[in-house]
Amino acid sequence: MAATPDREKALEAALAQIDKQFGKGSIMRLGDDTRAPIEVIPTGSIALDVALGIGGLPRGRVVEIYGPESSGKTTVALHAVANAQRAGGIAAFIDAEHALDPDYAAKLGVDTDALLVSQPDTGEQALEIMDMLVGSGSLDIVVIDSVAALVPRAEIEGEMGDSHVGLQARLMSQALRKITGRLSQTKTTAIFINQLREKIGVFFGSPETTTGGKALKFYASVRIDVRRIQTLKEGADSVGNRTKAKIVKNKMAPPFKIAEFDIIYGQGISREGGIIDMGVEHGIIKKSGSWFTYDGDQLGQGMENSRRFLRDNPELAQELERLIKEKLGVGVVKTEEDSPKLKAVDG
């Protein structure tokens, strides 16, 4: 039905009133193209950034990272914190598990002096602190580690063995209803780290489930399943893990993409290893035998030497990362100058 001039005039008056009362941009036509591009925080793994489809974790959204114990969940979150801080952002870490290692966080690039840390006594306290920080409008990223450790006050104050069915799920549901809108308004990324549990009596399908009820599954714009798939060795020594991350939910881009990357003990995600893997996969870096070359110059013999070479030459690593993202059309970051060609590391 065609809009008459009177109806059009009435609509424009209503839109003007909405903008005046609730702020400009409260309502708009989808075709106006006034939506800002999605801002992201890089994860530290180029493979994971590409799998997310937008170049990193979205600003102003809820992100859930879950998986088995020691799979790399906190490592991924801390890398995102470090990247947010490098961009001049303010980060908070709500350590409900009381297990944050400041030395390890510093090795991953986190500015521990500037990091806001809270070790709350109850789940209510943790989520209230988070709400107040987000409401300040000054925060860029907040991490909650972990949902399983957000124990309701009634459970802590009660007797051992008391039943508190659904208490944590109700707490999470109430908190997320309140916080989600504020996250969007303040462009704050909230990362909830979660643990896995097994449902009893499941014979078909996966018995695995996450803690905290269903609210987080609904409110999360991105859900990442992180698993350790292989132990990395140098000789007889274990030096790290090969990690697989599956994007099981993504409201920003197509879901179900898979990324693989290396986590080195004491160092975190190997950014350089990810660049080499993705570079070879997409034909930017050539592999001949055990040698890796870029643009006719040898990077090194073997993965470890090539990784060390890129670590020693960050300009080249940045150029390769830019070329890979440019080729895939994801999170392109332009640089003014190409890096010089450099001498390779022999193995």
From Swiss-Prot:
Annotated InterPro entries: AAA+_ATPase, DNA_recomb/repair_RecA, DNA_recomb/repair_RecA_CS, P-loop_NTPase, RecA-like_C, RecA-like_N, RecA_ATP-bd, RecA_C_sf
Cystine connections: none
Pfam entry (one): RecA
Residue positions binding ATP: 67-74
The keyword Nucleotide-binding is assigned to this record: yes
Protein name in the entry: Protein RecA
Gene3D superfamilies with a match to the protein in the record: P-loop containing nucleotide triphosphate hydrolases
Species of provenance: Paenarthrobacter aurescens (strain TC1)
Tagged with keyword Protease: no
